[in-house]
Amino acid sequence: MIKQAIEKVVNHENLTFEESEAVLDEIMNGEAYEVQTASLLTALTAKNPTIDEIAGAAASMRSHALAFPETKDVLEIVGTGGDHANTFNISTTSAIVVAATGTQVAKHGNRAASSKSGAADVLEALGLDINETPAVSYESLQENNLAFLFAQEYHKSMKYVAPVRKQLGFRTIFNILGPLANPAHPTHQLLGVYDETLLEPLANVLKKLGVTNAMVVHGRDGLDEMTTADETAVVELQDDHLTKYTVTPEQFGLKRRQRADLVGGTPEANANITRRILAGDHGPQRDIVLLNAGAALHVAHPDLSIQAGIDLAAKTIDDGKAFEELNRLLAFSDKRKDVVA
């Protein structure tokens, strides 16, 4: 299959959803030579992958992932990474705030690739066990409204792709597949992307993968987040319909900040930023978390406007519930460590 797929893509022909899924199955099963995988990834990058090619590849990644118990109405807050902005962990902090409102969040993430601190790094620095089994993570989702799914634990088949990606050294389709391959199969998703041209294609991919409500966002300062340093371009998926619009921090009563105000550091430094935000500190870092948490709450509860989501996120922090959520997660993690020990 992979030989035919390479030939098609080299000739600038598009693969169908089924063909893309099948060829990724071949790669994920270790049946393709590295040179074939490299050829396919290079050709896809040169051609630009289509919605069907991305969705088919994501479906294959999902099917090869470690199984996660079935969920209903679960939210994911995630970015593609690759913006090289070295911000603190905005999505992860926002996920904790959203979980504290009673909204279930299945956070799928990894260690840092293009930054100093990925979701796994900062959660580990906060004191959480990032290597929990699917059963334990599901239990956390039910008890604490938040589960972390460590990508490298769930996607063992990526071992067939990792060396090729490293040797190629440029962005490939896999740079956008991670956020689309959450084993919890979220129905609602706030997805940040590193390039504005990805907004509409990835919104359509999410739709194809069964996501019912989503916002795909790109900060025009380059962030793969909703940003307070510039406008944010948005494509929203709701009721099978896509809407494009732009938002500014000012329209939500937030100050426009400098991107330098949002820069983080090591996992330990970022963990301290997260703790301070959850504890109620005000400033630029809180504001961008409020914006992203507010957008995520709108995605999870479409009747709630982004502004109402921001207000709820602020109240959740100011009432101490967000910090309580972190403490619950830590207590749960410690309890499970004791059980294992």
Swiss-Prot record:
Q: Which reaction does it catalyse?
A: N-(5-phospho-beta-D-ribosyl)anthranilate + diphosphate = 5-phospho-alpha-D-ribose 1-diphosphate + anthranilate
Cofactor: record remark: Binds 2 magnesium ions per monomer.
Residues annotated as binding 5-phospho-alpha-D-ribose 1-diphosphate: 79, 82-83, 87, 89-92, 107-115, 119
The entry's anthranilate 1-binding residues are: 79, 110
GO BP term, pick one:
L-tryptophan biosynthetic process
Q: Does the keyword Zinc apply?
A: no
The pathway is:
Amino-acid biosynthesis; L-tryptophan biosynthesis; L-tryptophan from chorismate: step 2/5
Spell out the GO cellular component terms annotated for this protein, sorted alphabetically and separated by semicolons.
Answer: cytosol
Keywords linked to the UniProt accession: Amino-acid biosynthesis, Aromatic amino acid biosynthesis, Glycosyltransferase, Magnesium, Metal-binding, Transferase, Tryptophan biosynthesis
Residues binding anthranilate 2? 165
Q: Name one GO molecular function term.
A: magnesium ion binding
Q: Give binding positions for Mg(2+) 2.
A: 224-225
Please give the positions of the paired cysteines in each disulfide bond.
Answer: none
Cofactor(s) essential for the protein: Mg(2+)
**EC annotation from Swiss-Prot or TrEMBL:** 2.4.2.18
Q: How does this chain assemble?
A: Homodimer.
Q: Which family does it belong to?
A: Belongs to the anthranilate phosphoribosyltransferase family.
NCBIfam families attached to this UniProt entry: trpD
Q: HAMAP family this protein is in?
A: TrpD
What name goes with this protein? Answer: Anthranilate phosphoribosyltransferase
Q: Which gene encodes it?
A: trpD
